[in-house]
């Protein structure tokens, strides 16, 4: 089995760019950024529970990473960069720490390296469980209205929140809930030690107004690019800034 994806061929011999979206996003999430790198082959993936992969069930990160590997093989992607956001980051960081053939480098935007104690994990498990129940049983417009009131999204304007709520409400609440539980930060290992020892290029993008994740970026051995005029969702709030950073990273 493989994940649904959109593939755009590029010039032969160049590494592919593999984009992984955040929770409640889909393969369109990174398109405005990826389109600026038309010389590169690009693969925009739908993670389980989302978009064209909504019907694919998973029990945890191990299943997601197995599907990611199978998808890369099916598209004959042998040399690539992983570029992700939030949930997509956490998937790609775990995959990178475990080792994934052909990986040239890792670009993380607002990704959490993992909680560091059992109390924090227990609190997160409880919080994610409450959100999952809401996704299963309440209208998605109401759930996402509240979702985007969380402190991490404080930099969004009212118009941006409204647009995101409308967009994300097109999802399936049941499959979102299942993916949220399967890949909760509560079940993610603390990756700091392994991330600090990675032997390939590792870059971290974060919005200048995202103080929480700017602090987390300092805890891993990554080169940090601060995106001006942006918060947690930097590639949506300032896509041009993210494109500029990616161009520097990829030397394009």
Swiss-Prot record:
Described function: Catalyzes a proton abstraction reaction that results in 2,5-elimination of pyruvate from 2-succinyl-5-enolpyruvyl-6-hydroxy-3-cyclohexene-1-carboxylate (SEPHCHC) and the formation of 2-succinyl-6-hydroxy-2,4-cyclohexadiene-1-carboxylate (SHCHC).
Taxonomic classification: Bacteria, Pseudomonadati, Pseudomonadota, Gammaproteobacteria, Enterobacterales
Catalytic activity, as annotated: 5-enolpyruvoyl-6-hydroxy-2-succinyl-cyclohex-3-ene-1-carboxylate = (1R,6R)-6-hydroxy-2-succinyl-cyclohexa-2,4-diene-1-carboxylate + pyruvate
Keyword Lyase: yes
Keywords for this protein: Lyase, Menaquinone biosynthesis
Gene behind the chain: menH
Enzyme class: lyase
PANTHER family for the chain: 2-SUCCINYL-5-ENOLPYRUVYL-6-HYDROXY-3-CYCLOHEXENE-1-CARBOXYLATE SYNTHASE, PROTEIN PHYLLO, CHLOROPLASTIC
Family statement: Belongs to the AB hydrolase superfamily. MenH family.
Naturally occurring in which organism (per UniProt): Salmonella typhi
Biological processes, Gene Ontology terms: menaquinone biosynthetic process
Protein name: 2-succinyl-6-hydroxy-2,4-cyclohexadiene-1-carboxylate synthase
Pathway field: Quinol/quinone metabolism; 1,4-dihydroxy-2-naphthoate biosynthesis; 1,4-dihydroxy-2-naphthoate from chorismate: step 3/7; Quinol/quinone metabolism; menaquinone biosynthesis
Gene3D superfamilies, A to Z: alpha/beta hydrolase
EC numbers on record: 4.2.99.20
A molecular function GO annotation: 2-succinyl-6-hydroxy-2,4-cyclohexadiene-1-carboxylate synthase activity
Subunit description: Monomer.
Keyword ATP-binding belongs to the record: no
Superkingdom classification of source: Bacteria
